[in-house]
């Protein structure tokens, strides 16, 4: 059966059957006619791949393709995988341009991402509405935890714009939980009357959430994820909220963040101006303020370090919850990363 499957795909121009591609497959479905495969598709994590339909069935070509894609998408939805990608191949390169194109956002020459703009519209509608304003800035942060550096970045945006949206990433992969991070950001900017702090939801996406094990290089993972993030932000979120600029912090120590910032600049400018703000230095000889350094200090119980890097409100939270935070680390919570 596997040999027949591979032979069918090879006849459709798909020839990569390395173990690294096959081993992650969760499910493969096939459509038969007269005991011969006429269509197939597979799923690996969040990626739909190995999709092909027999060219000789052109009369039912679009119907069969859409049936396959619907079955695969439904399977992923049942599994809770709503951020769905399709890996382009010799077949899908042709078909996705003509069929179901309204459902898919082109990321690059290798990947498409499934659109669900109704969910995205619902997300935007939950944000506080404002009357039309000329200068609306945006800041996207993880705030793990909220530092003086984050505060400095938001202050810059606040001084130079009439309104600032601060999107806090919604991913439970951090030492500080999402509700804690949002609360810390709100407490840290409560004196800035033109700043609105919101949960970024599912569509303000960190590149860390991308299934990088499907990609060959880390730089590629950053590029793919940032492209999705930026294009959704530019064409759907920013347009809905009237956002005219985005503020990001420079990262002299992080190759990945530098790549991320470069992608933002190339994709957003000139319609949405990207401001790269130089990182704020900590007091003493600690160098640039870094949330990672704060997390490492929490792990070591080094209060002198985190006090120089975080706001007073964040200091109080860490002091009151130090044992709980350290316990999370002892249980395996990773503290590296951005």
From Swiss-Prot:
The record's annotation in SUPFAM superfamilies points to: Nucleotidylyl transferase (SSF52374)
Q: What does the UniProt keyword field contain?
A: ATP-binding, Ligase, Nucleotide-binding
| InterPro entries documented for this protein | Citrate_lyase_ligase (IPR005216), Citrate_lyase_ligase_C (IPR013166), Cyt_trans-like (IPR004821), Rossmann-like_a/b/a_fold (IPR014729)
**Gene3D superfamilies (UniProt xref):** HUPs
Q: Cite the Pfam families for this sequence.
A: Citrate_ly_lig
**Any GO BP:** biosynthetic process
Question: Keyword ATP-binding: yes or no?
Answer: yes
Reported EC number(s) for this entry are 6.2.1.22
| Top-level lineage group | Bacteria
Q: Which residues form the signal peptide?
A: none
* MF annotations from Gene Ontology: [citrate (pro-3S)-lyase] ligase activity; ATP binding
| Catalysed reaction, written as an equation | holo-[citrate lyase ACP] + acetate + ATP = acetyl-[citrate lyase ACP] + AMP + diphosphate
Query: What role is this protein assigned?
Result: Acetylation of prosthetic group (2-(5''-phosphoribosyl)-3'-dephosphocoenzyme-A) of the gamma subunit of citrate lyase.
Name of the protein in its database record? [Citrate [pro-3S]-lyase] ligase
Q: Which organism is it from?
A: Leuconostoc mesenteroides subsp. cremoris
């Amino acid at each position: 059966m596997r040999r027949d499957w591979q032979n069918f795909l090879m006849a459709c121009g798909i020839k990569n059957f390395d173990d690294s591609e096959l081993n992650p497959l969760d499910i493969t479905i096939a459509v038969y006619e007269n005991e011969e495969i006429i269509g197939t598709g597979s799923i690996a994590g969040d990626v739909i791949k190995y999709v092909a339909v027999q060219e000789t069935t052109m009369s039912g070509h679009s119907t069969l393709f859409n049936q396959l894609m619907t079955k695969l998408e439904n399977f992923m939805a049942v599994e809770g995988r709503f951020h769905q990608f399709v890996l382009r191949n010799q077949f899908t390169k042709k078909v996705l341009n003509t069929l179901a194109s309204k459902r898919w956002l082109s990321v690059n020459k290798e990947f498409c991402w499934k659109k669900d703009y109704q969910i995205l519209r619902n997300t935007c509608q939950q944000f506080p509405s404002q009357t039309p304003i000329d200068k609306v800035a945006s800041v996207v942060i993880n705030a793990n935890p909220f530092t003086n550096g984050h505060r400095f970045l938001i202050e810059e945006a606040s001084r130079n714009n009439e309104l600032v949206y601060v999107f806090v990433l919604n991913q439970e992969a951090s030492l500080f939980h999402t509700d804690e991070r949002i609360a810390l950001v709100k407490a840290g900017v409560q004196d800035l009357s033109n700043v609105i702090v919101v949960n970024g939801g599912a569509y303000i996406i960190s590149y860390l959430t991308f299934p990088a094990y499907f990609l060959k290089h880390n730089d590629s993972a950053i590029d793919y994820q940032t492209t999705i993030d930026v294009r959704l932000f530019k064409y759907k979120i920013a347009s809905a909220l009237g956002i005219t600029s985005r503020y990001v912090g420079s990262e002299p120590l992080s190759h990945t963040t530098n790549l991320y910032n470069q992608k933002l600049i190339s994709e957003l400018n000139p319609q949405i101006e990207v401001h790269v703000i130089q990182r704020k230095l900590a007091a003493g000889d600690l160098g640039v303020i870094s949330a990672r350094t704060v997390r490492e200090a929490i792990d070591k119980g080094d209060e002198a370090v985190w006090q120089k890097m975080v706001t007073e409100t964040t200091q109080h939270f860490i002091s009151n919850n130090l044992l709980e935070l350290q316990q999370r680390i002892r249980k395996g919570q990773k503290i590296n990363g951005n």
